[in-house]
């Protein structure tokens, strides 16, 4: 009887200590982690057609390079708060993504968003996960080979992107005389060139290759010209959330050290997409260098 009672008291003490530890840890959480532990889930903003970063492929949840990285972040968040955190998905566009992060409607924005100084004043960013730049997509046989060929031509951009500003600024600076129109998303922008409404689609080169692959249109459309901007991508979260920043930075460093960033890149840029096609875009030396620099150095 004494042994049983002793074991019961020991078990009770251990349970109380565990509960106390969990409670203390919960009290130490702030920002997004505190919110996630309280509500029991993480809200992720995704894009519907940002191939291969964040997109819908048939039925089911969003997929893509950014989505896989965000799933790794959510797994780390679950471990940090001491409970499994399922994901709630919210579709965002180029125009709605920033306000959704700022307002707290979404916890992470997992798409194809450029980090720049203007946005960094309003939101936090993960370490760089990709480096792209603005180029032009045109139909086969188009006379357009570079930005200077856009005189009196209609160019479509996706509303709310850095590409929209880049094209406007270049047009104003060099007086090219192009006509710029804005579409809701990348799929709509692609469709405007396909229909003949626009003669070129200006966005990040990798997204152009993604749209061509998604539509099985290799040989029908080409990406041309020099880079018109520099666009490093990152995952957005609320500005000033230091706990989440540390967790995200650590997650990226661990993935870089285990070469998981490299494997995730190969999965989405060199292997077959859900459509069956490949983008076939080897990792640039610049991005490879960025990933290597993330590796945690031994103490």
Language-model segments: residues:
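Short helix-initiation/N-cap motifs at beta->coil->alpha
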Residues: 29-31, 84-99, 142, 180-192, ...
């Amino acid at each position: 009887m004494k042994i049983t009672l002793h074991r019961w008291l020991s078990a009770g003490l251990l349970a109380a200590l565990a509960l106390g530890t969990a409670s203390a840890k919960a009290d130490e959480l702030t920002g997004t982690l505190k919110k996630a532990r309280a509500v029991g889930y993480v809200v992720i903003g995704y894009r519907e057609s940002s191939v291969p970063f964040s997109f819908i492929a048939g039925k089911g949840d969003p997929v893509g390079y950014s989505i896989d990285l965000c799933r790794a972040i959510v797994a780390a968040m679950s471990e940090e708060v001491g409970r499994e955190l399922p994901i709630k998905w919210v579709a965002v566009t180029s125009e709605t993504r920033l306000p959704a992060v700022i307002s707290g409607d979404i916890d992470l924005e997992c798409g194809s968003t450029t980090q720049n100084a203007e946005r960094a004043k309003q939101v936090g960013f993960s370490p760089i996960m990709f480096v792209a730049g603005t180029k032009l997509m045109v139909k086969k046989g188009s006379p357009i080979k570079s930005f200077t060929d856009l005189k009196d031509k209609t160019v479509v951009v996706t509303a709310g992107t850095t590409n929209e500003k880049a094209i406007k600024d270049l047009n104003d600076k060099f007086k090219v005389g192009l006509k710029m129109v804005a579409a809701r998303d990348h799929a709509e922008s692609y469709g405007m060139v396909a229909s003949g409404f626009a003669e070129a689609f200006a966005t990040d080169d990798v997204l152009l290759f993604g749209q061509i692959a998604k539509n099985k249109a290799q040989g029908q459309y080409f990406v041309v010209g020099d880079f018109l901007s520099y666009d490093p991508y990152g995952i957005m979260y609320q500005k000033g959330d230091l706990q989440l920043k540390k967790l995200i930075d650590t997650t990226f460093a661990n993935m870089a050290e285990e070469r998981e960033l490299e494997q995730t890149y190969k999965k989405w840029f060199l292997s077959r997409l859900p459509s069956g096609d490949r983008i076939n875009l080897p990792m640039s030396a610049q991005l490879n260098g960025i990933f290597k620099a993330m590796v945690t150095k031994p103490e």
